[in-house]
Design a protein with these regions (language model features):
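ABC-type nucleotide-binding domain
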Residues: 12, 19-20, 27-242, 246, ...
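Cytosolic ends of transmembrane helices, especially the final helix of ABC transmembrane type-1 domains
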Residues: 1-10
């Protein structure tokens, strides 16, 4: 009975993030300019903001990178863009539209998001790469894998792109998971790329080669990168440092 009550509670509870009853459209002619307008955020029940009065513009064709100490809110900041959370104050816009006014589905269709912890699904390599673009061609899949430096290990497997992937990617290494996650984002052809410390499991040589190829592929897109390694973001046109000194995190340019 207790279990049944819990299931009923989950099924009848409202989701924390909801779409407007009549959401607006981002439109087909947008370029993916992301702008934070005096954004503050605090977790539900918390007494202090994690992020406070953050303002910046990430322009198409340019890379905006975020650095800062562990726990300063870098991942929280980029997770506000796809609306994993909603801002407490201020607003985030893409091409001038408040992300809260757009349906979550349409918003996320414009984004290529690679999380800190790479996520793979049970299936094969091909289905994982084309997950965000199920109608994508074999050529698109191979191009994405090549840019992500994933062909290096895919080509050694007897079944190549049909090689099975266990749930969570438990049968591939951490670096291989990251490369497949990056390939999946590339194959989607998004306007906005978000890399949340997505290169940490790569060796230095692979990291450098991947970033060079990625820079060419994403030259017309808006790219946001959260990084621990300074070397990962030296090419960025805009580097923003998040500082946390016994007060909510703020931006330092």
């Amino acid at each position: 009975a207790v279990a049944a009550d819990r299931v009923d509670e989950i099924l009848t509870s409202e989701t924390a993030i909801e779409d407007r009853k009549t959401p607006e459209k981002l439109g087909e002619n947008g370029k993916g300019e992301v702008e934070f307008h005096h954004v503050s955020f605090r977790y539900p029940g918390a007494e202090e903001d994690v992020l406070h009065d953050i303002s910046f513009t990430a322009e198409p064709g340019k890379t905006t990178a975020f650095i800062g100490s562990t726990g300063c809110g870098k991942s929280t900041l980029v997770n506000l863009i796809p609306r994993f959370y909603d801002v407490t104050d201020g607003k985030i816009t893409i091409d001038g539209k408040d992300v809260r006014d757009v349906s979550q589905h349409e918003l996320r269709e414009k984004l290529g998001y690679v999380p800190q912890k790479a996520v793979l699904f049970s299936g094969d390599i091909a289905s994982n790469i084309l997950y965000g673009n199920p109608d994508g061609s074999e050529a698109e899949m191979i191009e994405a894998a090549t840019i992500a430096q994933a062909t290096e290990f895919i080509d050694t497997k007897p079944e190549k792109y049909k090689s099975p992937i266990s749930q969570g990617g438990s049968n591939v290494s951490g670096g291989q998971k990251q490369r497949l996650s990056i390939a999946r984002a590339i194959a989607k052809h998004p306007q906005v790329f978000i890399f949340d410390d997505s290169f940490s499991a790569l060796d230095y040589k692979t990291d450098v080669t991947l970033r060079r190829a990625l820079a060419e592929k994403t030259s017309g897109s808006t790219v946001l990168i959260v990084a621990q390694r300074i070397s990962t973001i030296l090419h960025a046109e805009q580097i923003l440092s998040l500082i946390h000194i016994s007060e909510p995190t703020r931006l330092r340019r």
